[in-house]
């Protein structure tokens, strides 16, 4: 069992009350966001199934599909697409043209522009430069099993889709690609154009 708080310091505060393992959280993101929305203050306005803090900025032509929480001071750039249950903590930036699917982003993290983050848990103060991708599915493999390395041991994840678990303060360079099941500790650095494939195909 992975201890998510060793990667994301605020994990217990934000998601610790839910019994699911970190691997299962994205698959039930819609339900979790709906439950958390019941506890929101009157400082949030509801638009469809999206709950947006009054201090957040949502630019024109943003698509919000499914249950979404956009926290205080967040910025969502034009033509961004959020779907499938998304939680944005305080001060998160989603730049123009980004897609975020079934993911949790902690305080002050940023996707610069034209990023994809699928079925992922992204810690506090993480920065993803333009075009970097958190892939959530092995389209190119006949074996779709997702594996991760936890404390030096290869673990088979109990889900068919999972992107990345990104520790606080991680920096991800432009056009980098993180393969499904990537786990990065706090303060990691991924170089521009780098492919992270922690568990190669068998």
Task: Give residue ranges: language-model regions.
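ABC ATPase A-loop
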Residues: 51, 69, 87, 165, ...
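Short amphipathic alpha-helical segments with coiled-coil-like heptad repeat character
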Residues: 28-29, 82, 111, 178
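Glycine-rich hexapeptide-repeat left-handed beta-helix
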Residues: 102-202
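Glycine-rich active-site/cofactor-binding loop and its immediate structural neighborhood
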Residues: 54, 58-97
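Terminal amphipathic alpha-helical/low-complexity segments used for targeting or macromolecular assembly
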Residues: 1-49, 54-55, 182, 186-187, ...
